[in-house]
């Protein structure tokens, strides 16, 4: 929605729009990043088995042959920035005009999803729930470890204690994950612009300053550990420089070219974790590598 009021050398304008992109989407089979988390499970189990064999905990790798997985995953999300912009334009000369204004931004994000029932063909057998398998395995190993400790058989206690710890670790990594969270926040963007028009040429320049934003989590469900309720996360809108040039070739034909540059490196953004390695990645990872 756009409106303008013009009087003499002044023009006062306002608009309301969804700015900076945004939208909503539903992924009934989850996101690719969800799949990447689960796809490493077979290899992780085989590697864990090899490690326990090397340490003398297991005589053979009972997880060899694990090469299949499945998962029930789902994601629905939205990211919207609603902007109310007000500004004034003044005609300095017959050829040059200047604009100054501000935009009030309101961020409305929402995420709902899950990763459930991770299964694998452990040891090349039938597909089973990995979390349940290793939870039961950990309980059995812990019971055996406690019994050996009571009998003062420290060698077997150490072996079954190691099995219980490793099984508990795998069970935790493959537990169901659920998220239901909204995020809201607001910030103000100062805007400056110049417009030059002479004969058949028209040149426009606009600069939008960096918008400092924090979004606050309103979390209903989260066992991912990533969206704690009440936490504020950096969500800046980067500064933007745009330049446009047009030339009137004919009264009914114009040629134009434009350039825009987002100053991403100066904007505060939340860090993320690599879904495979678990390492924290700063914003520069995404800016430089995508």
Model-found features: residue ranges?
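Active-site-flanking structural segment that lines cofactor/substrate pockets
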Residues: 1-2
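Outer-membrane beta-barrel porins/channels
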Residues: 6-290
């Amino acid at each position: 929605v756009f409106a303008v009021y013009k009087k003499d050398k002044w023009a006062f304008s306002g608009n309301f729009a969804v700015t900076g992109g945004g939208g909503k989407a539903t992924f009934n089979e989850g996101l690719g990043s969800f799949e990447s988390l689960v796809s490493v499970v077979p290899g992780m189990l085989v590697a864990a088995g090899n490690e326990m064999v090397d340490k003398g905990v297991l005589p053979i790798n009972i997880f060899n042959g694990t090469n299949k997985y499945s998962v029930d995953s789902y994601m629905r999300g939205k990211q919207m920035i609603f902007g109310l912009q007000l500004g004034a334009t003044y005609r300095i000369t017959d050829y040059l005009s200047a604009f100054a204004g501000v935009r009030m931004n309101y961020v409305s994000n929402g995420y709902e999803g899950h990763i459930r029932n991770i299964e694998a063909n452990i040891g090349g057998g039938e597909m089973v729930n990995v979390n349940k398998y290793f939870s039961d395995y950990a309980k059995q190993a812990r019971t055996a470890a406690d019994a050996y400790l009571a009998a003062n058989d420290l060698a077997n206690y150490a072996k079954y204690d190691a099995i219980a710890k490793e099984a508990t670790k795998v069970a935790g990594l493959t537990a169901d994950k659920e998220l239901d969270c909204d995020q809201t926040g607001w910030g103000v963007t100062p805007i400056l612009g110049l417009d030059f028009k002479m004969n058949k040429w028209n040149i426009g320049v606009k600069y939008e300053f960096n918008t400092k934003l924090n979004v606050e989590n309103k979390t209903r469900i989260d066992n991912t550990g990533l969206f704690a309720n009440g936490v504020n996360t950096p969500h800046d809108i980067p500064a933007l420089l745009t330049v446009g040039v047009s030339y009137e070739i004919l009264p009914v034909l114009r040629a134009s070219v434009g350039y825009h540059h987002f100053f991403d490196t100066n904007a505060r953004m939340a860090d993320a974790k690599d879904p495979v390695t678990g390492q924290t990645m700063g914003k520069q990872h995404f800016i430089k590598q995508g």
